[in-house]
Amino acid sequence: MKTGLLWFENDKKKTIKNIVFEAAEYYFKKYGVCSDYCQIPLGTLDPRMNGEIQVGEIRVVEHKGISKEHLWIGLDHEVKENKNE
């Protein structure tokens, strides 16, 4: 992921899905683009999920480089601007 936003959340009452939706909403308001990829700390998900879930259109994966209570949300691909506009 080349484009993203680091999100901090320490509310233990929120589910990972709620946190991802909240971060995605903020990301859209800030950048005007829908995120499609999110990295979360290792051990966040139930082991039966094999380290990956889908939250709406967002692919959520565990990653060793993400600190506890954080997530990295953004685009799994580079957005190409239309030079003709």
Please identify what each model-predicted range represents.
Residues 1-48:
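Amphipathic alpha-helical packing elements
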Residues 54-85:
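C-terminal edge-of-domain segments
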